[in-house]
Amino acid sequence: MRDKSYSKAIAAAIVTQVFWGLSFLASSIGQETVSPFVLMSYRFNIALIALTVPVLLGRQKLRLRGKSIKPLLLLGSMEPCLYFIGEQYGLRYSNSAFSGIMIAVIPIVTIIFAAAFLKERPSKKQWLFSALSILGIIVITLAENSGGSITFKGFALLCVAVVTGSAYSVISCGVSGRFSVFERTYFMQIMGAVFFTTLALIENGGSVAAVLAPATNLRFLLAVLFLALGASVAGYSMFNYAVSHAPMANVIVFVNLATVVSVAAGIIVLHERLAPVSLVAMVVVLIGIWGVQKYPPKENLED
């Protein structure tokens, strides 16, 4: 039987991917004004401030005394640090279709990692429906491709994103017994803030004024506030909760929902046109997600 924590975990996974799907639009708006490093610096510093407030008010506690923080360092290194380097710059050195296809592979790689390190083995039907969902994403990205070339550098960077994004999910699940959802999420924002602020300052010749200059741009600020509070604070908190209370295959397949949300946001907000085949592919993605939830391993049904 599946309990309430499982239902909450699946709900959290869905809401997370809505936030992350919309984050592509917010990132595009933010990068009209600044580089990816500066945008990430703002994002994670604001997120860190937001999460520090409840700590200072005594509403949340960090129980790290006597614990090794090496797992948290590894977690934060995978994501946000290395993942966003791979994703942001992988897209820059390849076309959008290839990038979308590479990122769509993350659920399958994550399931493989979970089977190897967490001993979570999905059912054959879950493998099938996961592949179906990925097929839908491939069709969408090819149909919506805006052109561009593919370089080896772009491929290598996207491989970094795939491996680190998959590793993050598995590590978060693996350390859930030692560190709370809040502790994991908080530490990720610390590492993101330090890492990307350092890179932003290096990129701008050490000029703090240059990094702070975009703060007067309202359109930029609204985009970065969504990224910080929605995609980082809410998104990572809910995803860390989800992987702690539901099988990895059931959670990670929702990653493909983010692409559906991203395409829908482009149509609604930016008035982009949707190819008919993309609409069919979006339905295929949703069927794939449904199938993964519908056909868990038999042992999960008996728990």
What residue ranges belong to the model's regions?
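Glycine-/small-residue-enriched transmembrane alpha-helix faces in small-molecule transporters
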Residues: M1-S41, G148-G174, T198, N300-D303
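Juxtamembrane helix-entry segments on the extracytoplasmic side of multipass membrane proteins
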Residues: S5-A9, T33-F37, S41, L64-K70, ...
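Helix-helix packing/entry segments at the starts of transmembrane helices
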Residues: Q17, M40-Y42, F84, F98-V105, ...
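Specific transmembrane alpha-helical segments of multi-pass solute transporters/efflux pumps
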Residues: F19, S23-F24, T52-I103, V139, ...
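Hydrophobic/aromatic residues within transmembrane alpha-helices
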Residues: G30, L39, R43, G90, ...
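Specific alpha-helical transmembrane segments that line the substrate/conduction pathway
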Residues: V38-I49, M78-E79, E87-R121, Q126-S130, ...
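Hydrophobic transmembrane alpha-helices of multi-pass small-molecule transport proteins
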Residues: L51, F113, P122-E144, F196, ...
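Transmembrane alpha-helical segments that form core, pore/gating elements
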Residues: L51, T110-I112, S149-V208, M238, ...
